[in-house]
């Protein structure tokens, strides 16, 4: 009987606790901008002109709550100032990477001379610097190799920013890169699509959405489609960070940081506005105003060195004629803390304040914390180096193959190794200081290995160990030989 009651209770609970599955829910989220629009916005931030930023945000919808998109109440306008931090970040990152790039050399003397001529004529390292900045700002780009006997007898290397190219993929592999070149003829805009694929280059001219003959404008009259060996493509993409938003495209370092840059500009603009509003004001009774010694007229105030506000002279019997100066109190510490917080959010995950020359004593309390923050610069630098180390050998190889194809010579693979010098960061200096201590419980070989790791080859490290031992007076003696054969004969 008792078991039947228990079973009945269980059945009642089961029916009571039935859980219905949730109905499928669909969400629709609209992107604010496409890739080209986002690239344009990032370019304006990089240019760093407050007038251009103000115009840009007046045209972007749903940005009324942002600092640059807001419109002040009439009579309460504030001067919007831009710190220029985005441009400083990009230029600094590009500089600390490319300044350590070692020269590319080949074992073949003829190739070495040819590459030096190509580098000199194309100003290649300047182009690489510009390309790196554009890839950081826009997200990606591509190098294009072409030939024009009227300009040069060598390959012409050009870089196109990400907003001027399309990258087409086939099963996760790059199929072709389309370069967009704009021409304006008789106030009409034409766009040339140069499609660079494996073994071919094709040209199409568009006016709006309509395809036009190539002879429609003089700039494209002599262009013809070409085919060559299908083993290579005369275009090489340059992507530093992969985009999570646009599949197959690069990601700008500004993506996800625009709101932080906007807040930093707001903090700085408010601070400057408070300083301007907090100027000392001098109130002078009319009877004490400075006058011309000849005419007796009141001298007109000078905005540079003689500013004052005129007040009526007191008429009471015991009036005290005096000049009053008032200085409003500006909460400087509050503005500093706001500015530091906004600055920290802007640099987070990108670069260390000390790399930019910013005094971060108010951000970091000790040297150890500063060295840890400096590692952020190393992570970003290593990501840029990795992308250059992947792109540059491909570009050099394709350049030589394209040149041989143009000369109707057989093509061959060209392999190079891209190397960079060491970045003198506080972390490395701390390692040197620690390992140079003679009381460190490590052998010389272990210290050299810990200090240089994979950045130096085994031969270099063995030679370094030998030099250190010689300098410290450590002598390595050969193992004494024992003439066992003579001893056995005796």
Regions inferred by a protein language model and the residue ranges of each:
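Extended, helix-rich architectural segments
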Residues: 1-159, 164-168, 172, 488-490
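Surface-exposed loop-to-helix/strand elements on domain peripheries
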Residues: 107-108, 292-293, 312-430, 466-474
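Activation/maturation switch segments at domain boundaries
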Residues: 261, 437-490
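Short amphipathic alpha-helical segments
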Residues: 110-114, 120-128, 135, 256, ...
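Short coil/turn segments at secondary-structure boundaries
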Residues: 130-132, 147, 276-284, 356-362, ...
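Extended, charged amphipathic alpha-helical segments
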Residues: 224-369
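Glycine- and charge-rich intrinsically disordered segments
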Residues: 1, 5, 11, 266-272, ...
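Extended, regular secondary-structure scaffolds
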Residues: 130-132, 136-138, 142-251
